[in-house]
Amino acid sequence: MYAARAQHIDQVILPALNAGKTVLCDRFTDASFAYQCAGRGLSEAKLQLLNDSFVSRMPDLTFWLDAPIELGMNRARARGALDRFEQEKAAFFEKVRAGYQALSERHPERVKRLDAAQTPEQVFAQALQYF
């Protein structure tokens, strides 16, 4: 996972940033913290070691798309085939959500909570407030 992330940074993210473009990723280091540390119990020290070793550029801004767990699970089921994370129980997602909450408290200048219970258009409008 981290070798692919390092390659993605070097071949996609950094060239785009150097060209003056804005880069949006659907998952990155904060998702790794929420899912692997908060959700699965990986130690933060191990994750930090991986980030220090493989991640040459940390995000300037993270949007945390927060919605009630049951709503998120219903949306995933409505899309069809569930991936391995989407097959987890609600208790796992409560831990992940708590992880994102902890990140937003630890880095309030960078991690922004968006109310994802709203329509996609409303969520997009929330995100635009930070640009």
Predicted regions and their residues:
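Short, conserved catalytic or interaction motifs in soluble domains
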Residues: 35, 67, 116
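NTP-dependent small-molecule kinase module
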Residues: 70-131
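ATP-dependent small-molecule kinase phosphotransfer cores
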Residues: 1-55
